[in-house]
Amino acid sequence: MDSYIDIKVRVWRQAGPKAQGHFETYDLKHVFQGASFLEMIDILNEQLVAEHKDPITYDHDCREGICGMCSMYVNGHPHGPDSAITTCQLHMRKFKDGETITVEPWRSRAFPVIKDLMVDRGAYDKIMQAGGFVSVNTGGVPDANAIPIPKPVADEAMDAASCIGCGACATACKNGSAMLFVAAKVSQLALLPQGKIEAAARAKAMVAKMDELGFGNCTNTGACAAECPKSVSLANIARLNREFLAAKFKD
């Protein structure tokens, strides 16, 4: 049964992109363990406002593990110490009474801090704009049911499509690589007939944009898949490598 705990929250505070950041520690008492992590931040912000202090700025939207906006490091882990969840799905029952919880923004050169825990993840949007779509005419909605796709292939495409673009893979990687994100977005389309027509151009364009934006190289450490809140498989990176190599041979 959930109870109430007293905690210390050690939060990264940074006034702006060019400002010098620092940690500040706050005491928070009588926190219900059934509360979500973001609800705890909300309670802390109410306390800060009541004390006439600047509330903590952080990104959030759906609070259902879908949008990927609640991007923050919690005790050294992207999205927190629990596995296969986003920060908004993390609950305070994961923490103990008297514990100090350290909260930081994404650690990646490609995701600059805007303020406090909020970062600019626009780099992922630019990669998607480079080729993460189907632009050819694939017919109307009923036509999709006329194209037979084996269930194992459809399942693989669906697993790749579960990527929510949160950025945990790039920030968990010691090289700051976005390969798992790019691989998931390439795979979900390359596996399906509608996406095969532009597969070569897509792989080259998205990898080129990833490199242009300053993401690091993949060295197969597997940290990205270990921290991914949607458990996207490393097999997608292998598929991206095959797609990219095949595309280069077509040049």
What are the residue ranges of the model-derived segments?
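Eukaryote-biased recognition of intrinsically disordered, low-complexity regulatory segments
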Residues: S3-D27
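Short, contiguous acidic and Ser/Thr-rich linear segments
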Residues: E24-S36
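Ferredoxin-type iron-sulfur electron-transfer modules in oxidoreductases and energy-metabolism complexes
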Residues: A35-D54, I101-D251
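Long, hydrophobic/aromatic-enriched structural stretches that serve as scaffold segments
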Residues: K53-D54, M69-Y73
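Glycine-rich phosphate/adenylate-binding loop and adjacent beta-alpha elements
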Residues: V74-G98, V103
